[in-house]
Amino acid sequence: MVTFFSKFKYCCEFIRFDFQAFPQMFRYLITISLILFSCEQPILYHATAESIKKKIESEKDNQAILLNFWATWCEPCVAEFPMIVDMADEYENDLAVYFISVDWLDEEDKVLSFLKDQGVTWTTFIKDEKDQEFINGIHREWSGALPFTILYGKTSGEVVDFWEGEQPEKRFRKAIINAINS
């Protein structure tokens, strides 16, 4: 009988162990374990403006994309969060939703706890860059106010809408449908 650990040991024989990559490898092992044991948990990656742009570039041909920049201490962010999660489920075939937390890195556990409470089981990000550098790198018209939402068109891959501040469901829905059809 082949066990998980024997499979893991076999796979590791082909991987050169790198102590600098240990935190990332540990995250992958946790993710694999959660998948194997059917425990869906949010995955939180550290991100810079550049890495987020690369993620968008790699995904833009498949679906419309919604980026939501938020923080656990931001009341309007927390208020609109469940609505965005519901819309992510509703439009899952046509819309990729990425939450990017701008909380401090030492608040990572708090961010993960909030994501879990909200039922987020997909890849999310936490800002790992100085505030102004991050803000300027994301969008030239973003003042830094939260929440901040950007939508990229499904076909065009270009920014089709963006806004600062909490918005009603009607505004989100109209913008999402426009992004899916753009």
Regions inferred by a protein language model and the residue ranges of each:
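Positively charged n-region of N-terminal signal peptides that target proteins for export
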Residues: V2, P23-Y28
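Cysteine-centered motifs
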Residues: C11-C12
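Sec-dependent N-terminal signal peptides
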Residues: Y28-F37
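A short beta-strand-turn-helix
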Residues: I43-I65
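Short pre-active-site segment immediately N-terminal to redox-active cysteine/selenocysteine motifs
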Residues: Q63-I65, F69-W73, W104, A145
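Conserved redox-active cysteine motifs that mediate thiol-disulfide chemistry
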Residues: F69-D86
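Structural microenvironment flanking redox-active thiols in thiol-disulfide oxidoreductases
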Residues: F81-Q118, D131-N136
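Thiol/disulfide oxidoreductase modules built on the thioredoxin-like
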Residues: V120, K127-A175
